[in-house]
Amino acid sequence: MVVDVIPQAPVDFSESKVKQLLAKYRRAQAIKDQWIPIFEDCYEYALPQRESFYSESIAKRRSERIFDETAVVGVQEFASRLQSGIVPNYARWAEFTSGTEIPKDEQKEVNEMLDTVTEYVFEILQNSNFSQEVHETFLDCAVGTGCLLVEEGDAVHPIKFKAIPLPHLLLDAGHDEKIDHIFRERRIKFRQILNAYPNAKLPVRMMEEMGKNPDKECKLIEIVYRNYNNTKEEEYQFCVISETYEAELFSQTFKGMGSNPYLIYRWSKCAGEVYGRGPLQLALPAIKTSNLVIELILENAQMAISGMYQVEDDGVINVDNIQLIPGTIIPKAVGSSGLTPVQPAGNFQVSDLVLRDMRQNIKKALYNDMLGTPNEKTPMSATEVAERMADLSRQIGAAFGRLQAELVNPVLQRVVYILKKQGRIQIPTVNGREIKIRSSSPLAQAQQQQDVATLDRFIGMLQARLGPQLTNILVKQNETAKFLAKKLGVPEELIRSDKEMGQAAGQIGEMVQGLQQTGMQPRDSINALQNITK
């Protein structure tokens, strides 16, 4: 017997909703508790300045256990290298282009319009705090998971970015293993609640506590979760609840692509896991080993400087009264040897070999040791810079695809969503068909250099076998120029359209005929341009 299952609508009772959300929050907390020991080790050895996952006082010194700073410096360089390769400052690291549903004869006009939109979007990004905040998220990405909050701003700053530390974040995944529940723990003073959430409705007990202690901090939980009942478009529910008072203070619905303000991205992940795994987790054994080796070296150095001594227990020398300082007179019994230095056992010469290997492994895991160390005396050439970026692109190819899908595209979709909401731009929906996002960052261009190299080899082989004239006839020069411009990120307005190419070719033909009538031979450059009309 076949039974039709009728989907049930979610219960609207506020109290029941709060209990359900708190149950999901505690389940997400249980998932995170399994990861906290790994996260805390990464923070302790490589990010000691970051907030701990355990309750600690503000500005507590956490660097006492760090003896080797290779990982501390390396993770900062990793974040800077990642930022310069994917979202470099004051550069267009992506662009909007026409999708597959736009007719080819209209794509150039649409791309020129989208190029103007791209310029405005990146002007907004460059005048915002995006660069500062995304660097903070890249530090968390080294551990495995980063979070960037993108909110609507004011008239001066239309968009505000905020890096959410991993200790404040709890995640849960849905049926497709995509993150569909985001919990942010936030401590805020009572008097600041209505400033942060102007339309919040506070329960009576919270209002009474606010009147008594307005500067007292309370814990709130911001929740964003996916509403799967809406199958036509993306829909998210945003709400703020208090675990202490078991009440919902504020709720809001977000609809459309780019409406989710929380952007979660991961370096890599294993199947079935919610949180990502970053390069710091891979390098953690080497980090601990090098830290221990340096600690032992320092202990051995202290032992070599201060020395160890043995003394005969003759009842004359009282070791508690001896101070090893210049000018000290130490009595000794007749016939005894007094204080005798003890030679330490062990050979610390092997420590240099172990330490060198461990440091090299750490730098390699954090992608800081590529093609050797640049020569400080000689500045890097453009070819060397391009080759180093290509080497980085080859090493992080898999992670780059995930960062493109979970960070770059969502950031631009979110920015476009906010700017459209504010009426600053007019653009169709960015859904991959009408309009698509194409990355033009240094890492993306380094990956596309393979296509350019393939074209160069193809044309070189044709010229070697058939000669340059027949090659010009076989290869479409104008299409080749468009292909190279697309791969190298050249703006669309710099390339002539087919109509403009025809007009230019006609003018060149008239010039050639005029030169032939005067008996002069046309120049090689004119011959090359004339081949465009063939």
Residue ranges and their predicted role:
Residues 1-47, 51-56, 308-534:
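C-terminal anchoring/interaction modules
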Residues 7, 94-111, 119-126, 265-285, ...:
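Charged, low-complexity surface segments at secondary-structure and domain boundaries
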Residues 14, 151-324:
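Structured, contiguous alpha/beta core segments that scaffold functional sites
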Residues 106-153, 275-310, 343-376, 385-419:
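Long, contiguous amphipathic alpha-helices that act as assembly "spine/axial" helices in icosahedral shell
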